[in-house]
């Protein structure tokens, strides 16, 4: 997890792990989770600050031959051995978007259960759901099989991008929506308290030129999901 108190350790950590033969490293921004905000003392990186910090890290990391791949949450997946990368905010490459896609394909493929047995759309939402009294099922009380067949939980994780567009005029009219696919629902809830709200991190990425900055940072490396905003 990266925050304002540890960015200077990233490159050294990455180089050490690469030298040890580690195949993959994942970096994630410590987000606005309720408990973290209570104890973080202002350490959370702002969205633009996070992007800039990660680009600085990537720029330094790829200066030398590497083997270890890097997954920077909501920023990029980087594969040094093939000199290729993908911008993670590009959920759908050109021509891939469909209204029928779930709002989060990760949620649709993985059941998240908290320590009390409550199911949530994803693990990052467990604190939010608990703090706001949101309940969509419990595996100890109702059993997993029934939760996966009908009810609030399955309705949540099967919600589609078409439903999001119908509930969110800003996203529906945005030229970047067909690429970001609405972004991350956990980030949206943290900032807007609306499961169909905007994900401001994706607005920042596309509207403030961070896609182009990533392409510039990676230079001649192959972009696995190139897009254009015609």
Regions found by a protein language model. Name each.
Residues 139, 190-199, 203:
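C-terminal accessory subdomain/extension
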Residues 110, 128, 177-180, 186, ...:
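Secreted/processed peptides and extracellular or luminal domains of membrane proteins
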Residues 121-124, 168-186:
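Local cysteine-cluster metal-coordination motifs and their immediate loop/turn environment
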Residues 183-189, 195-196, 214-218:
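Short cysteine/histidine-rich zinc-coordinating motifs and their immediately flanking basic loops
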Residues 126-175:
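Membrane-interface junctions of multi-pass transporters
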